[in-house]
Each structure stands twice: as structure tokens, then as C-alpha cells.
Amino acid sequence: MMLNKLTEIVMKKYLFFLILFLNFVSSYAQVKDTLKLIFIGDIMQHGPQITSAWNGESYDYSDNFQYLLPLFNYADFVIGNLETTFNGPPYTGYPAFSAPDDFAKALKDASIDILVTANNHSFDKGVSGVVRTIKVLDSLYINHTGTFKNYEDFQKNHPLIIQKGSIRLALLNYTYGTNVGISKSSVLINIIDTNEIRDDILLAKSYNPDGIIIFFHWGEEYHRLPNTSQIEIANFCIRNGANYLIGSHPHVIQPMHKNILDSSNNVESVVYYSLGNFISNQRGINTDGGAIAYLEFTKNQNKLHINRAGYLLSWTWKKFVNNKYIYINVPSWEFNKIDSNSADQNAMKTFLDSSRNLLNKYNVGINEYYFDKNQNKLFPIDTKSYEYK
């Protein structure tokens, strides 16, 4: 009798520890997958930028992104709007852009992984410009969507699938139109049309993604608030199943919203109406910098959540060195790289102040971050104690 009682106690303890062990193994097996995405705005090549890059032998853009490389390496994917073509020489800036191939290589070297190519400058150099741009990107293994050299290319890259581990997202890209008329050819470009977008969202869903991203080229240039059309298109897309909307074209930053859309299914959505200029020669107030969107996803038990939705600010420094200008994208946390109290530093301060005043007033659920390269982490800007936030 005593032996049976002892055996029963031992078995209960064994079962207790076995259950604990199995729970541990189960929770370990369900380690959350994460995905970190960065989005950047208008990547431009005005004439002075092209002239600046020439070193007598080639076009050197190595200065452009030096301060952002640690942040971009931190992300799993960096996605930007390519607002130039690679049509070969002669190289031209505004109004019909064609940049050196070296600039494409500089984007690749800066850890920019994906470029959306549907914008009003896509056809600046006609059909040949579209085709050659895609060939240059393909040669550098830079993924792309928005314009397509033929139907086969369209089928391959529309939607563009972004995947890390078990997390899978579908990316679509559209523009309101092009500056140069689109001639009939095998080349394709995605134009904003709600009927087409609805169909494309259904197509994207057939790939069983965890979420759908749409990168739009829309809105009014130099307007700091979204217009009615942007808001209506955003609401339409979200109602039809898109989750994360990114905007470009206005060349200035516009507000950002994170929403819980529908209490019945608790869908999360984010809209960044415009990220402004990532790099350009535009020097007017609010056009000399931009926002960097940051989305961090966690997937647990087959459900994707936005762990963090934020933004970071950066400014294009047109620095005079050795009798010429060079262009450097300076993020807010590298403010002190610019000479103290100089006209350049004051210009960056003006940009940061103006951007924060706008976004602090109109943003919903999306706050500013900075990147600490020593800790390789993002932190809320309010925790940063540098000379100028």
C-alpha cells in the first residue's frame, strides 16, 4: 500500500515536470518571427547632383548615404521610390531625368533592397528608358515593381513578394500618371485606378500574404497635408484588404496614421501619406529632407502584428568641399556632424523643427525614433539626449 502511494506521488511529479517541459518546448517552437522594414521617399538625381558626383573618371556617390548605412543594415529590407531613369548618357536632371548607372550601384551598396519605379518620371526617356532602367536594376539584383519591360516581367514582379522566415508580404506600386505620354508598347506601368487596384489586391491575396503593402505616387507637390483624393484612395484600399500604405510625390512630408480599422476583426493599418525627399537638390523649406518610415512586424500563432510603427527624420546636406558641393543624407541623430552654428546646421534645424511641428500635430499612433549605431537599436526620440533633437 505504501509502495503504491509512493509510486503515485512519483508519477504525479513526473507528469507535472513532463507537462512543464512540453509547454517549454511548445513555446520555444513558437518563437515569434520578426520583420523590420524601412521605406524611404523620393530618390532623385537633379543636374547638380550628377555634376557633383563626377570625380574626373567616374561618378562617385559614396558620400551620399554614409551616415544611414548602419540603420539600413539593421533593417531586413529597405524600400524606396526611384524617381529617375537609368537610360545611359547623356545624363540629365530635371525635367527629364536620367542618372549614371553608378548611382544605382550606390543605392545597392547602401543596402537599399527594393525600388518602386511607377512615378511621373518613369517615362522621361520613353520606352527605352523604362526598359534600360529595369535591366540596370536586374543586373544589380535590386528587386523592383511598378514598371515592367514586358508582360513576363509584370507577372514575375506584380505583386512583389517580400519574405523573411514565415512572414510574407505582397507589395504593389502605382502612380497617378506620367509627365511623358505612354506610347503603346510591351512596356507596362501601374496607374492608379480603383477598379484595377481592387483586382490587384485580390490577386495579391491569392499569394497568401500576411499583409499587403501599396506604395503610391500621389498627391499635390509641396502640399503638407493629404488631399481628398489621397484620403479616399487610402480608405478604399484599406476597406478592400490592403494594410500598409506608403506615399511619395509631394516632395514634402505629410502626416502618418496608424489605425485599428474594424472592431470585428481588429485589422491594423498604417498610412504614411508622403515621406518627402530622400535625396535631391531641392533646397526650399520642407523639401530639403524627408521622413524614413519604420515598420516592425511580429508573427505569432499565424497572426501578424505591427510591433512598432514609427519614423525617423533625415536632411540632405549640400556640403561645400574642395571647391565643389557634395550631397550627404544626414539623419537627425547625426546632427552634430554638421559644423556647429553654421548656416547648414541652422537649415537642418529649421527642417527638423518644421517637420516635428507638423507631425506632432497631425500624426496618429506613429512617433519619431532615432538609431543608436553603438547598440544597434532604435529608440524613441524623447529618450535621446544629444545637443539638438
Specify the residue positions occupied by each region the protein language model found.
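Sec/Tat signal peptide C-region and signal peptidase I cleavage site
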Residues: 25-29
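Acidic, metal/ion-coordinating pockets
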Residues: 30-389
